[in-house]
Amino acid sequence: MGARNSVLRGKKADELEKIRLRPGGKKKYRLKHIVWAANELDRFGLAESLLESKEGCQKILTVLDPLVPTGSENLKSLFNTVCVIWCIHAEEKAKDTEEAKQKVQRHLVAETKTTEKMPSTSRPTAPPSGNGGNFPVQQVAGNYTHVPLSPRTLNAWVKLVEEKKFGAEVVPGFQALSEGCTPYDINQMLNCVGDHQAAMQIIREIINEEAADWDAQHPIPGPLPAGQLREPRGSDIAGTTSTVEEQIQWMFRPQNPVPVGSIYRRWIQIGLQKCVRMYNPTNILDIKQGPKEPFQSYVDRFYKSLRAEQTDPAVKNWMTQTLLVQNANPDCKLVLKGLGINPTLEEMLTACQGVGGPGQKARLMAEALKEAMAPAPIPFAAAQQRRTIKCWNCGKEGHSARQCRAPRRQGCWKCGKAGHIMAKCPERQAGFLRVGPMGKEAPQFPCGPNPAGADTNSTPDRPSRGPTREVHAAREKAERAEREAIQRSDRGLPAARETRDTMQRDDRGLAAPQFSLWKRPVVTAHVEGQPVEVLLDTGADDSIVAGVELGSNYSPKIVGGIGGFINTKEYKNVEIRVLNKRVRATIMTGDTPINIFGRNILTALGMSLNLPVAKIEPIKIMLKPGKDGPKLRQWPLTKEKIEALKEICEKMEREGQLEEAPPTNPYNTPTFAIKKKDKNKWRMLIDFRELNKVTQDFTEIQLGIPHPAGLAKKKRITVLDVGDAYFSIPLHEDFRQYTAFTLPSINNAEPGKRYIYKVSPQGWKGSPAIFQYTMRQVLEPFRKANPDIILIQYMDDILIASDRTDLEHDRVVLQLKELLNGLGFSTPDEKFQKDPPYQWMGYELWPTKWKLQRIQLPQKEVWTVNDIQKLVGVLNWAAQIYPGIKTRNLCRLIRGKMTLTEEVQWTELAEAELEENKIILSQEQEGCYYQEEKELEATVQKDQDNQWTYKIHQGGKILKVGKYAKVKNTHTNGVRLLAQVVQKIGKEALVIWGRIPKFHLPVERDTWEQWWDNYWQVTWIPDWDFISTPPLVRLVFNLVKDPILGAETFYTDGSCNKQSREGKAGYITDRGRDKVRLLEQTTNQQAELEAFAMAVTDSGPKANIIVDSQYVMGIVAGQPTESESKIVNQIIEEMIKKEAIYVAWVPAHKGIGGNQEVDHLVSQGIRQVLFLEKIEPAQEEHEKYHSNVKELSHKFGLPKLVARQIVNTCTQCQQKGEAIHGQVNAELGTWQMDCTHLEGKIIIVAVHVASGFIEAEVIPQESGRQTALFLLKLASRWPITHLHTDNGANFTSQEVKMVAWWIGIEQSFGVPYNPQSQGVVEAMNHHLKNQISRIREQANTVETIVLMAVHCMNFKRRGGIGDMTPAERLINMVTAEQEIQFLQAKNSKLQNFRVYFREGRDQLWKGPGELLWKGDGAVIVKVGADIKIIPRRKAKIIKDYGGRQEMDSGSNLEGAREDGEVA
């Protein structure tokens, strides 16, 4: 310490302690900074004695100056300290560090006569290589010369490596020492390292790799002129094949300089970083602060690991700002988050000093109380009781024993008794056991001591003085007086009773104001007429409020609480009005975080703390009508199972879940036992299949399991489990008898013991639905009281997530546990998860990510069908986060009808697929949580095996992935499959997130629109973007719509004999060529395909092919990309080779040109030629109205093939394909309405959902008034009971709502792109615009053409339900509805009559029977299960009047009746 003590002495040391560390800061320099600087100098090979003089400090600054821009924080601090010491030695006055640096800078500029400024240490910037004053390459007289490295620099480098042993400090140390060096100098530094040859070898390998990459990227340009400097190779940069002079020339030549020194330094840094990672394998993500570890120690470890990270400065800066705070312990994290955004390291270290001590915790609690005042106040525990102040030391009033000046007396300062101290005084305990009556007979306020009588310090069940009997007698007397007073006020003041009734929250047996603990009990009180918000705190002895002026008649008091001691003013006999009751009590005013009423006022108000026990009401369950319970015999069981079942039943009986069945119970269900997963314990199972058949049906309330990707990102998560979930739900008493079962005995040694369930049993079909319903009812108040909490409940698994503090989050979890425990649900501690990772629903959750729990694929020698099914199930489960999982070939192993135990023979493709899946599963994948404010996106990709994969993400964060490989058709088209994939993703997104994502599809827009022309039903697909990730979905061949001029035309045909299965396929061309092939074991369709394949194979690059097979035309027009048919795949391969191909269809056997010739060629005139009439009138009809296929077929009697060909040959109708009609499940009165736009006009469209009938017209503006007028027109023409629209402003306007109310229309609204929304009218808008485009030239104005198009669509378009036009279908539905209503009305009248009748010669009257129908000559009567036809003359019809029936004695009873009823 000698040298260190001699650095600054006497006045110089005093001057040091006057200089501030920061401008305007409080901290100043101390001698410890000098000691630290002396230690740091040794690291740089500098003697600490240099600090003793001005010249020595100047030498230090000269060495440190070039290292500051790229140096560490320690280096900058050392530089700053030396600047301050220099100023003291030079007798330069400096107030702080910055001023000292400025003075040093001016001095250095004056001495070196240069304008260069000292680098700033606050924001390091890397200087360009070669710009400095102390570098090995220096400019002398305009020439660059090389100065070898000094021994001090080499010694500092060797010492750094030896001390740190390739720690994280080696990389920045090398950067600083090698700044401006040539490769020669860097090799000299590496050669100085004697040990650590393994690390040196790693560096050499990195150098070789980088040199090879350099050579590959910079090829030799060719021979150079004599005397010209060559370009450096990789070995030149490494210094092995180049001289120092060449290196300097490359670095500093005027044109195209190559900084070989900087490049070589970067290579070495890569190698050093690799060595650091090898010598220090700790990941920075694993650097976390221990519970009791000082924050400074944690920061040291963090930065040491940070230096070893191989990443750019931006990422390191992010790690510093994020991970340093995130991985701190909870105490430090709470402090750091209070510092705001991006605090400095010094601020962090200062704030976290002493974290964890009692003082810091008290400060945190006080601050938390103050922060919580605005949103929701939290209780503040007041100090010790000081109501009736009497000194137990001297016996005088007016002061306490603490303030007494008399000599101390032994004993308790609270009660004055000996044997204990005040902290353990029994009088300080608060008892809240209720003595008074509970229920509806209770008074307005719960019973308690009389505020004017009993001492408010005493508790209801523990007297402070006097015998217990006297206290209880006084309490009962006060209670009787209070009840009588309230009863008198009720009799005299009805308003008082009404006011009290309104204050009661619900009827749970306590007729008094009740405060739910779902939130803090805060009420408004008036203190001497001044309103204040106060917290009712049963844990506080005194009452303290702030902001109230009560005058000067007070006594000063000091009370203690969580936040420390508070100076207060105590006022006695203050009038307080709260909850419509007035009392006088003692209250204090002071600087309290929250206003509280303690027990002194609560007791005076007559309040008490009660715990009402809630009860789950059982739900009434019945058997199906006419069914009885199960009566099955118990099958034999092994002795081991019987003993296990006996033990289980005895335990369940003790816990109240079972009870013995009475001997009168006739029902029984077999029971048995199986081993649990651990193979040590048994599980009781009961075969409730028979009981499930006869039990009434239930509805599953929760249809699916929640997905972690749908959870919002929260800071804190807790997972808990409801133990014995079903066994916590009581079973209705009337149903318990049906759950009876019997425990048999060995050898029938004794009668079996019979039990019935008192709770919902496992295996019974009603347990899940009842449990779900009950849990929803239980948790509903909790959800409403905590809207910021995410509560996910699926069966017995509960997840709670929030952004609250640890304390608040744990408090909410504790409230939930207490709620469940209070209702009889257990929450076992072994399944309570407070710290990540959380095991939940098969997932592994973390606060910022989620994963699947570990997936282990089975390893088997012999695989059965059941094993493959389980394997595929596991892989499908993994596919939600592991992209690339495939199961197609595995599923093919178990195609067909196979038993579960049948052995499976593996194929090579299936084995390869399984191995590929194993590789995918070996790489762990993570998912992220949903952020509602960000856009939801879905990216779809297609692999080479026609399997589709997709990921749903928000930016770069993946929420989940999935796959799709369903191929429903033999011949598939990639675009059609893509539409199916989008539909699946859309449905999945609606279920999980309730919104449709934006799609990124691997298809070109032209390809999509070309296919969409024929399959326009996919127009509901929302916004999508094209992505160029191969393989793209393409239409593989160019199918043109018009005949190709100059190309050869092929007419194809095929035929087959159904008996012999022999056939022919062939073609004939317009150029005289023909070809026929004999086929065996074929079909007509196969023969047609063979003929088409022959034509495609034998044709040139362009061809016209005419077919008469609708089957072939349908396959080719669909443009399949692959097929399971060998012939179709051959056709696809051949058509890909064609430049263009035109395919058309003509009706078979119509005598059409080459088609007739090829028909004779392949069938030799066997077929009969039919000529169809009325083709021309049908074509004229279509050209005028553009009718659809079914309308032409119906009106002109044409086959559908011919009618479809007429439509297909129409250029306008060919723009969009024929609609694929489906059945819409809709009521008669349901309409959908929407507005669309055309040519700048607004068209309002209404569609009858069930029939497709359309009403449309042009409106001047899209307003509520115009929409309401159109709705009135619509309602005046057609029956309408339900109108469905989107949520546009015109449809949600008051005018439309008023019209809907006046007419009696139920109005509902949908959302865009929802398949269950306004899809019918959206599609009809599309139809209407297409129809208008076909006939647009027939009218001038939009108003006219809209009405003409509506006429065509309603009367000229046939198809759908009933093969009718929309107008016919709507009228048919209206008339059918009227007829049904008439018949139902008539049948309901007939049901009011009974028939007595005679049969044959039997003179006895029989009956009564139920009248089904009454005709002119006979009636139809139902008697029991028989239906009889009785002549009118043998039947007597009477009306059923309930309890009185009159016989019809004459035919006049069937005519006019007094009540007007006629049978």
UniProtKB/Swiss-Prot annotation:
Enzyme Commission number, as recorded: 3.4.23.47, 2.7.7.49, 2.7.7.7, 3.1.26.13
Amino acids binding Mg(2+) 3: D1234, D1286, E1322
Cofactor binding, note field: Binds 2 magnesium ions for reverse transcriptase polymerase activity. Binds 2 magnesium ions for ribonuclease H (RNase H) activity. Substrate-binding is a precondition for magnesium binding.
Chain spans, region Disordered: 112-138, 441-508
UniProt entry tagged with the keyword Lipoprotein: yes
Binding site for Mg(2+) 2: D1053, E1088, D1108, D1159
Region (Dimerization of protease): 513-517, 561-567, 600-612
Compositionally skewed regions (Basic and acidic residues) per UniProt: 462-508
Cofactors: Mg(2+)
SMART domains: ZnF_C2HC
Superkingdom classification of source: Viruses
Chain positions of site Cleavage: 135-136, 365-366, 382-383, 431-432, 445-446, 512-513, 611-612, 1050-1051, 1170-1171
InterPro entries given in the database record: Aspartic_peptidase_AS, DNA/RNA_pol_sf, Gag_p24_C, Integrase-like_N, Integrase_C_dom_sf_retrovir, Integrase_C_retrovir, Integrase_cat-core, Integrase_Zn-bd_dom_N
Peptidase A2 domain residues: 532-601
Stretches the record annotates as Interaction with human PPIA/CYPA and NUP153: 191-228
Residue ranges the UniProt entry marks as DNA-binding: 1393-1440
Lipid-acceptor residues (N-myristoyl glycine): G2
Region (Interaction with Gp41): 7-31
Motif Tryptophan repeat motif, residue range(s) on this chain: 1008-1024
Gene Ontology MF annotations: aspartic-type endopeptidase activity; DNA binding; DNA-directed DNA polymerase activity; exoribonuclease H activity; lipid binding; RNA stem-loop binding; RNA-directed DNA polymerase activity; RNA-DNA hybrid ribonuclease activity
Residues annotated to bind Zn(2+): H1182, H1186, C1210, C1213
Pfam families in alphabetical order: Gag_p17, Gag_p24, Gag_p24_C, IN_DBD_C, Integrase_Zn, RNase_H, rve, RVP
Any one Gene Ontology BP term: establishment of integrated proviral latency
Chain span(s) of sequence motif Nuclear localization signal: 26-32
Keywords on record: AIDS, Aspartyl protease, Capsid protein, DNA integration, DNA recombination, DNA-binding, DNA-directed DNA polymerase, Endonuclease, Eukaryotic host gene expression shutoff by virus, Eukaryotic host translation shutoff by virus, Host cell membrane, Host cytoplasm, Host endosome, Host gene expression shutoff by virus, Host membrane, Host nucleus, Host-virus interaction, Hydrolase, Lipid-binding, Lipoprotein, Magnesium, Membrane, Metal-binding, Multifunctional enzyme, Myristate, Nuclease, Nucleotidyltransferase, Protease, Repeat, RNA-binding, RNA-directed DNA polymerase, Transferase, Viral genome integration, Viral nucleoprotein, Viral penetration into host nucleus, Viral release from host cell, Virion, Virion maturation, Virus entry into host cell, Zinc, Zinc-finger
UniProt protein name: Gag-Pol polyprotein
Gene: gag-pol
